[in-house]
Amino acid sequence: IMTKPVGAVCNLACDYCYYLEKANLYKENPKHVMSDELLEKFIDEYINSQTMPQVLFTWHGGETLMRPLSFYKKAMELQKKYARGRTIDNCIQTNGTLLTDEWCEFFRENNWLVGVSIDGPQEFHDEYRKNKMGKPSFVKVMQGINLLKKHGVEWNAMAVVNDFNAEYPLDFYNFFKEIDCHYIQFAPIVERIVSHQDGRHLASLAEGKEGALADFSVSPEQWGNFLCTIFDEWVKEDVGKFFIQIFDSTLANWMGEQPGVCTMAKHCGHAGVMEFNGDVYSCDHFVFPEYKLGNIYRQ
């Protein structure tokens, strides 16, 4: 289960973000803050439901670091309280702009894996990833990454592939090699625009092909050329040095193994998400009213 302690709240306003407008689903809860009561209930029940000796907690946003460090320290205390002999691991996704020495010390001391959202070199990243004032965010993200490296925190990158950066696959890939990022996840962005009465503008899957493709969407041809170009470069000299999730997952599928990524699995629905108020959905990309499964308090 991917847990969202701040819901859609974020200090950035990326043009392509599919999650910012989820705040419109919870207008009656303007703060979008997970309570200590819900945190404890979730940790207890989540650990108790596991059948394996290792339990992984995944913290996602919005921007996860908009909750104070004390929240995550509390979470770790509760994990220890309810561990029942299991090994607990944590990973957290962040845009990197709010990272400090204190945050990085906490992550290193407790062996958290940190995922950083960064869309390649500055020109590519700043095309769509801006703050709420419309200012670019690349410099602050790189400051955060350098802090992670300084403190020896294990980290990887999630990079959105859009209509702009998809045109420069080798520049894009070489950037991650230059900043010594050895684990990279590519996330192609494709959205349709449909206006809703509650203020949302992105179409759900239930709406099919209604609406026009958003301008930032990567085209099928762009995505294919992007992957093929990077693969040809990667396979020549970087196998075993740099790990690209989609290549590893494709190989795993080919070998009859578990791909490790839900989009390549035989069945959808193994990567659920819980919102700040306990609402549960089958997927981070299915947070729409019609796909709500229930609430941790009621179902």
Language-model region placement:
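Short cysteine clusters
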Residues: 10, 14-17, 262, 268, ...
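Glycine- and acidic
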Residues: 3, 22-28, 57-61, 126-130, ...
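Radical SAM enzyme [4Fe-4S]-AdoMet core and its adjacent flexible, acidic
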Residues: 129-139, 146-263, 267, 273-277, ...
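Radical SAM/AdoMet-radical enzyme domain recognition
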Residues: 39, 43-58, 67-205
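Extended hydrophobic secondary-structure segments that form protein cores and membrane-embedded regions
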Residues: 2-4, 56-62, 89-94, 244-246
